[in-house]
């Protein structure tokens, strides 16, 4: 028979670790992290570092804002917690009574009625928005591919020029520059120089990466803001390439005005 001497159980416990975090907490952390990263970009990086650094930071910020909240990063080192475990004396054999009744089985915890309704509705709405966003992106890419097949292609070395009368606004996608009719002389050269800058810096690949993340985190307004800022950096970098090539600023502004280049990048 044991004498009831208390025992000691030691177990490491890490502060801030409470198991898997809830979806709501993860969403809040995603919003906080993405907002913090974009605030840092706006305050400390815009017009202070190169266009390349701005592009890389914005793309990395979009991915990190989704990855960092998913990590279980401890804020404090693990500490050892001592739990006293009293040893209970065994009862005498003659006082032991055996029960024949069965203990009731523990049933599943049924959530409240509104939770049973709200959870599938929220999941269904989220997945619907994701599939729609990815579907629209796929349709746009398929449309660009079909347009390329119908266009007259010219190998220009660093890029492929696709010309078609139905192209209203010049744009570039991956290694292809799309150009409509009516572009001759220096106007044509300036527009091609602008679009060649997008191809050279692989702007389309960055836009596609951000679009994919935005399709999964469509509820995050900061991802949409990051995409718009990234597009602005792309345009600034392409503009700088045109001016560095020796074209006059006033002439370039005139060409851009009549070309309506605010929509020059579609993807």
What are these regions (language model features)?
Residues 190-203, 210, 238-239:
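Active-site recognition of the HExxH zinc-binding catalytic motif
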Residues 74, 201, 225-267:
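Short helix/loop segments within enzyme catalytic domains
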Residues 201-231:
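A Zn2+-metalloprotease active-site environment signal
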Residues 33, 37, 131-144, 206, ...:
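Alpha-helical transmembrane segments of polytopic integral membrane proteins
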Residues 1-35, 45-47, 51-135:
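Hydrophobic membrane-embedded segments
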Residues 46-49, 73, 77, 106-184, ...:
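Juxtamembrane/interface helices at transmembrane-helix boundaries
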Residues 20-33, 47, 171-172, 182, ...:
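Membrane-anchoring hydrophobic segments
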Residues 41, 45, 68, 72, ...:
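Membrane-water interface at transmembrane helix exits
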